[in-house]
Amino acid sequence: MTQQTAQQEQQKSEVKIYSREELKQKTLAELQKIGKELGLTRTTGLKKEELIEKILKAQLEKSRLVFVKGVLEILPEGYGFLRMPENNYMPSWNDVYVAPSQIKKFGLRTGDTIEGFARLPRENEKYKALIRMESVNGLPPDPEILKRRPQFEKLTPLHPMERFKLEYDPNELSTRVVSLIAPIGKGQRGLIVAPPKAGKTVLLQKIAQAIIRNHPEVYLIILLIDERPEEVTEMRRIVKDKAEVVASTFDEPPERHMQVAEIVVEKAKRMVELKKDVVILMDSLTRFTRASNAVTPPTGRVLTGGIEITAFQRPKKFFGAARNIEEGGSLTIIATALVETGSKMDDVIYEEFKGTGNMEIHLDRRLMERRIFPAINIEKSGTRKEELLLEPWELQRIWVLRKFLSTMDPVEAMEFLLEKLRRFKTNEEFLKAMNA
């Protein structure tokens, strides 16, 4: 009986395992051949997608292995789990256990995107277990290659030097105004400072659409913390499959908010280590800090508004990860900060983050009340070191424009700028026409 069991295990291990992506790349004839090898009786007359599903199911029955893809979270105990994007990287029954020996052998880190094969749970086990890795962040699972990866914290941070093109529609004035008043570069650490109902979420959506349209090389993550579920659905429908939307809604506990945000930024860091450009649009940094305050053990050192001094450590580590990297790659974080909510804590949170960013967009309640969108306060908004992002002739004209607009009331200034922008299809045309 033991010999027979051993033979069965050997036969299982000899079954060639295909991932869903590998099967999608094969022709229908090749899929039919694979199906026959797996013992499928009916392979003709099926659509390609139907045949792929049958092959995956047959593979699972024969080998007891299943193809998995997730983001690694290493726990303090030394082992880890692959968290699934469809579950917003939250712990779930669908997670895959990763042994400490695998983590140590391959030099794996929290945030690594791993593809591979896992076996189903045995008796008295709760989770699938990772058996074989196919790739780590798109790299082959070679311990020598993976252990030579640079560490994000040791890379050289620089000021942003390459500007994001945010103009994608002549009639979309929100992103055109941002391009003029507070240009965003690769590696920017920006705050959108907004009172309630001033249009911060809509502005984030417009920025997301601009990046998707003009910068397909960028990996875009939209992180929604403590937001309403319907806003999550709306954002997913706007960006479709062009960006990753990760959310922890207001009905989740603060621990979940922290865990989701931290695994997202670790995933972004692993991509930047491979010289990729990543953008995180976060709504909101204020609620993330509130969640941090809720999970921080009380120390007795409390600021005005009831927030622990140590509650800022994790949000600052998150926000401070944004940087342009000299060796290649960048991590851009644009986060919203709430003000004028009636909560002293929110004002203290904004004051604490005020000097940490290198770009700020201030939304103004007065413009919002007059239904002027974008409700941007031009005088208060701007980008540090904007001369690195703009052409010299653009910079000179924008300075002249700002000087002229500073003599006006914020409402008049925005109305004037919008009226002028509507006359031209692009910002370049508008700036060149300023001579006349």
Curated annotation (Swiss-Prot):
Domain of life from the UniProt record: Bacteria
**Which PROSITE patterns does the protein's record reference?**
RHO_RNA_BD (PS51856)
Q: Please state the Enzyme Commission number of this protein.
A: 3.6.4.-
Return the CDD domains for the record: Rho_CSD, rho_factor_C
Q: Which Gene3D superfamilies match?
A: Nucleic acid-binding proteins, P-loop containing nucleotide triphosphate hydrolases
Q: Does the keyword ATP-binding apply?
A: yes
* SMART domains noted in UniProt: AAA, CSP, Rho_N
**Quick one: which residues bind ATP?**
G185, K186, G187, Q188, R189, G190, K197, A198, G199, K200, T201, V202, R228
Q: Which UniProt keywords apply?
A: ATP-binding, Helicase, Hydrolase, Nucleotide-binding, RNA-binding, Transcription, Transcription regulation, Transcription termination
Q: Which residues form the Rho RNA-BD domain?
A: 65-140
One of the record's GO molecular function terms = helicase activity
GO biological process terms, alphabetically, are:
DNA-templated transcription termination
Against Pfam families, the record matches this protein to: ATP-synt_ab (PF00006), Rho_N (PF07498), Rho_RNA_bind (PF07497)
Q: What does this protein do?
A: Facilitates transcription termination by a mechanism that involves Rho binding to the nascent RNA, activation of Rho's RNA-dependent ATPase activity, and release of the mRNA from the DNA template.
The record's listing under NCBIfam families reads: PRK09376.1 (NF006886), rho (TIGR00767)
Subunit structure, interactors included: Homohexamer. The homohexamer assembles into an open ring structure.
Family membership: Belongs to the Rho family.
Q: What HAMAP family does the record tag this protein with?
A: Rho
Name of the featured protein: Transcription termination factor Rho
Taxonomic lineage from the root: Bacteria, Pseudomonadati, Aquificota, Aquificia, Aquificales
